[in-house]
């Protein structure tokens, strides 16, 4: 079978007829291109993926037709395998945080599992190695995406050990080849984003953020917890916890080195401050 210049090969397709329903089950193998990926996931990937890309896929499907031969129900499960998949990130600038970043993300020897059905449910799972540049050693990445009606969920687990991470605002730097891992859960519903969970950690440092809701301009409308325990570039152990409950914000810290923040503020002509990332919290702050 050929569809949109792509060949489909099937080992088995079976059908079952009764008075009201026609049930069709089967499998097929094919090559997936950019247009088909965009159609399946209802998203245009042309700015991120090469339009000449062809990926190997094997799928199982189930289709139910009513007596007028209109689709009543369907389910598609696909497994896509690849040796290398380059994602172009020309419009994303992470260089000031990830010094090795070269505006590309290359998946290595990975697998994508895709589930689509007629109940407005979509699930995508990616398990792969990755590199940010050609000199790096591939590290693990896992990505899960699900969509049920209008609600979307993203789950990311990534090993950042191969790359230098520089967070000047908090005077933190992680060198190349030093372990660091990121776990991230984000949900989106009706154009409202919520950071459910953020963990950036290794054996010496830990950053945790929970239940952050973003408004316009990605300013923070609400949050539950912002917590950090880390060694800064002065080898000083910082610990800080910011908790919000109802209209009360509690800030606790036994040790926190703000010398670099003061120095940067004195040098900078930018009059912005930390609280500008928040949007009208109207809270009482207890320190």
What are these regions (language model features)?
Residues 1-287:
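Membrane-proximal interfacial segments on either side of biological membranes
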């Amino acid at each position: 079978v050929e569809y949109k210049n792509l060949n489909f090969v099937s080992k088995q397709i079976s059908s079952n007829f009764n008075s009201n329903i026609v049930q069709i089950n089967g499998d097929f193998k094919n090559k997936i291109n950019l247009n088909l990926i965009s159609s399946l996931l209802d998203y245009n990937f042309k700015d991120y993926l090469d339009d000449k890309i062809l990926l190997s896929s094997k799928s199982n499907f189930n289709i139910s037709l009513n007596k007028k031969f209109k689709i009543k129900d369907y389910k598609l499960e696909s497994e896509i395998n690849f040796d290398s998949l380059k994602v172009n990130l020309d419009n994303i600038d992470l260089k000031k945080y990830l010094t090795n970043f070269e505006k590309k993300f290359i998946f290595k020897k990975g697998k994508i599992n895709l589930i689509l059905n007629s109940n407005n449910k979509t699930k995508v799972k990616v398990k792969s190695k990755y590199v940010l540049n050609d000199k790096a050693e591939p590290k693990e990445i896992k990505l899960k995406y699900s969509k049920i009606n209008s609600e979307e969920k993203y789950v990311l687990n990534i090993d950042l050990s191969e790359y230098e991470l520089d967070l000047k605002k908090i005077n933190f730097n992680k060198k190349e080849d030093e372990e660091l891992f990121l776990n991230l859960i984000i949900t989106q519903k009706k154009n409202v984003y919520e950071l459910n969970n953020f963990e950036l950690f290794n054996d010496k440092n830990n950053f945790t953020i929970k239940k952050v809701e973003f408004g316009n301009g990605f300013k923070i409308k609400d949050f539950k917890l912002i917590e950090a325990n880390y060694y800064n570039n002065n080898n000083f152990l910082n610990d800080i916890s910011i908790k919000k409950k109802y209209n009360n914000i509690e800030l606790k810290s036994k040790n926190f080195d703000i010398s670099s923040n003061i120095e940067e503020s004195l040098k900078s002509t930018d009059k912005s401050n930390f609280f500008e990332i928040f949007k009208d919290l109207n809270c009482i702050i207890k320190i």
